[in-house]
Amino acid sequence: MFEQKISSEALTTTTSIPATGQITQRPLRDSVRQAVSGYVAQLNGQDPTELYELVLSEVEAPLLDIIMQYTRGNQTRAATMLGINRGTLRKKLKKYGMG
């Protein structure tokens, strides 16, 4: 169909596939952990509200953007890659001003 170029960094950080067939995401998890820890360290005793939603949106928006670019805007293919139905994808794209 078409040739997709993936950087070697992306391969080493996100696509190690063990015998189970599952993609190993430890480097991604470690990056998120480090970012959240840095954010919490800067709170200085304050308790923010909706931290869960903040973290999810900070990860979800770029994920959707990257997958939509990868699939060249094909929402059906993107939804399949993400493991969500197309209607849910459309809602999320609208939420982040991408659809």
Swiss-Prot record:
Region (Disordered): 1-25
Pfam family, one: HTH_8
Any coiled-coil regions, as ranges: none
InterPro entries registered for this protein in UniProt: Fis_DNA-bd, Homeodomain-like_sf, HTH_Fis, Trans_regulatory_Fis
Keyword annotations of the record: Activator, DNA-binding, Transcription, Transcription regulation
GO molecular function, a single term: sequence-specific DNA binding
Gene3D superfamilies cross-referenced by the UniProt entry: Homeodomain-like
The organism's place on the tree of life at top rank: Bacteria
Start-end of DNA-binding region: 75-94
Summary of the function given for this chain in its UniProt record: Activates ribosomal RNA transcription. Plays a direct role in upstream activation of rRNA promoters.
PANTHER family (UniProt xref): DNA-BINDING PROTEIN FIS (PTHR47918:SF1)
Family that this chain belongs to: Belongs to the transcriptional regulatory Fis family.
Quaternary structure annotation from Swiss-Prot or TrEMBL: Homodimer.
Name recorded for this polypeptide: DNA-binding protein Fis
Native species: Psychromonas ingrahamii (strain DSM 17664 / CCUG 51855 / 37)
Phylogenetic classification of the source organism: Bacteria, Pseudomonadati, Pseudomonadota, Gammaproteobacteria, Alteromonadales
